[in-house]
Amino acid sequence: MPEPQIFGTHEPKTLEQLRDVASRADRAALMADGHLGYVMPIGGVAAYRSQVSVVGVGFDIACGNAAIRTDLTRAQLPPHLRELADAIQETISFGVGRKNQADDAPTDHPLFEDSAWEAVPDRHERDRLRAKARSQLGTVGSGNHYVDVFADDTDRIWVGVHFGSRGFGFGVAHGFLALGQNRAWGERVPERETLLDVTSPVGDAYWQLMNLAGRYAYAGREWVARKVVELLGGREQELVHNHHNFAWREEHGGEPFYVVRKGATPAFPGQKGFVGGSMGDDAVIIRGVASDSAEVRDLQARALYSTVHGAGRVMSRTAAAGKRTRRGKVTKPGAISREMMLAWVKEKGVVLRGGGADESPHVYRRLPEVLAAQGPTVEVLHVLHPLVVVMAGAEEFDPYKD
């Protein structure tokens, strides 16, 4: 196998984790926003001939970003952005296990009748999982998931969202993690590498449900983003939408592969993507470069046509926010205080609702630096400046934050 393509600089443990993944994959790469993950580093990309990694795709299957460019300008926004932030917080459901309470919640979406549901091996589990998915479609969750309102350099307003397939994807991941270790669906098993042969019955079932979770995540992000555009009184002019925790069938060097991206954005020449920074930093709309340069094309190929999915964490959640009990009692203080976080976003002029110290801008790299480390493989089309950021509250207990 070729040596993995590594962008940027990384902690030794992150590189060790990449080498471990690469020892089982046919090709591998690590993006500049990479950091230590579960089994596979965040920012990692791995290509397999006939396998897919359940842990590589991850527990939040199809986590990704969607951005809508509206017909509005900054001058057309309400004069008090705090009221807009409150309206988003009241309209969209944030947090672990939350249900979509909106009158027009998409509970009748066609994906709930998809034949892929039959791939869940147990009827009781299938019904339970589908019911949960139905109730959560169009909810955002917690952790680093968000709804943002941006203005670009021309003062055009964008709405951006980041989240995945919610409890549905989590249930699929845990179910197949067990099946892949020869245990029953629902049993608790170690979070270790679990490679499924896509041509096997279990691998085929996972592939079907992973793709269904991908459709589910797309539907949820589009519903939320369009709901916020509706709140703004605007109209959609462009949608940029991508997963960054997923597996795809792709051709590389004329050969077919199953490509797993764990916290990495697809960036084929001409393909657009939406990449966030932090609650107090700019985001970007990027596009894979279509270059005449053989050197650039070779670098893109070695990156498996991938780029960063964000700025990249440099401080763990526990180091940043400390440890708390489920009731919120601090058992170990963290390095980042809420006051530090609020001072940063205030200086940037951002109206923030929710968010915790574990998501403060202090815990991330700066996005321009990681984009520069990717070299000439992608180009920035729009820089998006955050005006309103809405997330789950700091008090939200989530044992699965990653």
Model-derived segments and spans:
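N-terminal cap/recognition module
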Residues: 50-71
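Acidic, glycine-rich loop-and-strand cores that form catalytic or ligand-binding grooves
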Residues: 103-112
